[in-house]
Amino acid sequence: MSYKEEWTPEQRAQADVKCKALSDADTVKTDVAGKRNGTKTSRYRKDNAIPSNQDVDHTIDLQLGGPDDAINMNGLDKSVNRSLGKQINNLIKDLPEGTVLGKFTMK
């Protein structure tokens, strides 16, 4: 995956942390239709005082088999979250459901 040119060192560090978490997890392409519960993310945002410049991120993306549960959520810079989520989607969109994925890297 790629850093955005305009990302700050802090944003790049957040992307690195996310990438490491994905590499350390057992990730598999997963159909996410109907698996996202907006109430859970809204509750997590409120209960954990996530600032407005951050999204509630699934550390292991739902599209990679992560659970839609508070244990898999944290605050992440909006630009980092949305960019990495889209990049992951683009990388896996043509893979068959159930494809096991390995190491994720940033460049």
Label every PLM stretch briefly.
Residues 1-107:
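Nuclease and nuclease-like effector domains acting on nucleic acids or nucleotide cofactors
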